[in-house]
From Swiss-Prot:
Signal peptide: none annotated. The lineage of its organism: Eukaryota, Viridiplantae, Streptophyta, Embryophyta, Tracheophyta. This is Zinc finger CCCH domain-containing protein 34. A zinc finger (C3H1-type) spans 14-43, 45-71, 91-118. Residues 409-420 have a biased composition (Basic residues). GO terms for molecular function: DNA binding; mRNA binding; zinc ion binding. Transmembrane segments: none annotated. Residues 452-468 have a biased composition (Polar residues). It comes from Oryza sativa subsp. japonica. SUPFAM superfamilies: CCCH zinc finger. Residues 397-477 are annotated as: Disordered.
Length: 493
């Protein structure tokens, strides 16, 4: 209290304990920072309640979290202390307030616990007062019952038996009396649980609703218990679940080695990419191959279009490894993963990918007719083993050679057209026309026409002799008769 009194006389002490109004508004508003003469307390900035002891002029807590507004316009007169409060302070002197020393006590003088620093002399004096102020208890026995008559001299705010103040025995020896008093005070200061219980009882008895509201806010904002748990997270928004799903999909379709799934669809068609009239594919019955015709103007895809098992590019494998890899019976068995893969990639067959405009007019090696192996041959093992090593390698890599017997439909069409032209040219060569000598008269034209008709009738005159053979047919003959006629004809020759 003396320090508080001295602090009231010192204006610098009052100024350093007064809150900075700029800092209360925002920490960045005060431009002085640590050089500011007023107090910068973060706890007071978030707490809107004023310090009761600050208005009384005796707040000695440097870390007080209540606000200390300026006191120039306030009345500095101090009210006299209530005798009941003095008696209560004499009783509560040995019990320091836990909330006050943690900067959270909002009861002021109504708090039943000590709000001042505890010294050894104060502990001895308060312990003596506590022993003298205990009520006298007289016990009288009536029969088997014990009747207790107590005389209460001071009303204790804590009526619970768990909140009774521990008495410190006073030693007669003055040398050890002070040490025992200090040890008793330290023992009583460790009962924090009793402080909490008594403060809860006093909160129920107090009529200050604003104080109760403050403690309710403090209980709501207690650290360590306000834990927010979100149980509504779905698997779709879970990053770990998405990464796991993507990795599973990659492992599931790793055997296909697909970079662009649209190009591997058997129904993929891009009219802007193919600048030609659509052609069709067909099956070569002689060898059992299905070819995809790509006429002139088509360009290479980034990946080869096949319907068989796909190989990674830029790999060279021997023929024995091809036999072991591609003709394993397990590779030709269907599974659930393959079925799901085909179903997934057939759903996007109508997607058309645009190609750069500068590739439409490209020419060169890409303009040649290309085809890819679509189905395995009917007699796959025997026919492939009979192929040469180079041809077998090209076949398995999807780059099939172009022999004459494996011509495409477009090649067949060109071939047929060439044959027709050859036949027409042969017919024209059989009937050579005379050199043009000039215009002819009508008589000459009729004469040439008669000559052509006579030659035609001469050629048809031989047909009755041929048909006479059919007129001599008498019916079916036995084998012996046929042999006899054959032997006769051979003898006649």
């Amino acid at each position: 209290m003396a320090a508080a009194a001295e602090g009231d006389e010192d204006p610098r002490w009052r100024r350093c304990n007064t809150d900075c109004v700029y800092f209360l508004a925002s920490p960045f508003t005060c431009t002085k920072g640590s050089k500011c003469e007023y107090r910068h307390a973060d706890g007071a900035r978030f707490n809107r309640r004023n310090c009761w002891y600050w208005f009384k002029g005796n707040c000695v807590n440097p870390s007080c979290t209540f606000r200390h507004p300026p006191l120039e316009n306030l009345n500095k007169t101090k009210s006299l202390a209530d005798p009941l409060s003095l008696c209560s302070t004499s009783v509560k002197a040995a019990n320091p307030c836990y909330f006050y020393y943690n900067s959270h006590c909002s009861k002021g003088d109504n708090c039943p616990y000590l709000h001042e620093p505890l010294t050894s002399n104060d502990a001895v004096g308060t312990s003596c007062k506590a022993t003298t102020s205990n009520p006298a208890v007289s016990k009288s026995y009536v029969g088997d019952e014990m009747v207790e008559e107590s005389k209460d001299t001071i009303t204790n705010p804590c009526q619970d038996t768990s909140c009774h103040i521990k008495e410190v025995p006073v030693s007669i020896n003055p040398e050890f009396g002070e040490a025992e008093a200090v040890s008793g005070a330290l023992e009583t200061s460790t009962d924090i649980d009793e402080y909490m219980k008594c403060s809860a009882v006093s909160d129920l008895n107090s009529g200050d609703s604003t104080m109760d509201h403050t403690e309710q806010d403090e209980r709501d904002s207690s650290p360590g218990f306000d834990v927010l748990v979100d149980d509504c997270l779905s698997n779709k928004s879970d990053l770990e679940h998405q990464l796991t799903t993507e990795s599973d999909n990659k492992v599931l379709h790793a055997e296909y080695g697909i970079r662009d799934p649209v190009l591997y669809d058997m129904y993929y068609h891009d009219p802007e990419y193919y600048n030609y009239e659509p052609e069709f594919c067909g099956l070569d019955d002689r060898q059992g191959y299905l070819y995809l015709c790509q006429p002139n103007g088509a360009h290479e895809h980034e990946s080869e279009i096949t319907l068989g098992h796909l190989l990674p590019q830029n790999t060279e494998v021997t023929s024995d490894e091809y036999d072991r890899r591609f003709f394993n019976p397990r590779n030709f068995t269907s599974s659930v993963a393959d079925t799901n893969f085909v179903h997934q990639h057939t759903q996007i067959r109508h997607i058309s990918k645009r190609r750069p405009e500068n590739r439409k007019g490209a020419k060169g090696k890409k303009d040649c007719i290309k085809r890819s192996r679509c189905l395995e041959p009917k007699n796959s093992t025997q026919q492939i083993e009979s192929m040469p090593t180079r041809q077998r390698k090209d076949y398995l890599m999807g780059e099939c050679p172009q022999p004459a017997n494996h011509a495409t439909f477009r090649g067949r069409r060109k071939k047929n057209r060439g044959k027709q032209q050859h036949v027409l040219s042969a017919k024209s060569s059989e009937h050579p026309t005379a050199d043009f000598t000039g215009p002819k008269t009508l008589a000459q034209i009729k004469e040439e026409k008669c000559k052509s008709n006579s030659s035609f009738s001469h050629s048809t005159a031989c047909t009755p002799n041929v048909r006479s053979f059919s007129d001599d047919f008498e019916g079916p003959k036995s084998l012996t008769e046929l042999l006899m006629t054959k032997s006769r004809s051979s003898v006649g020759k």
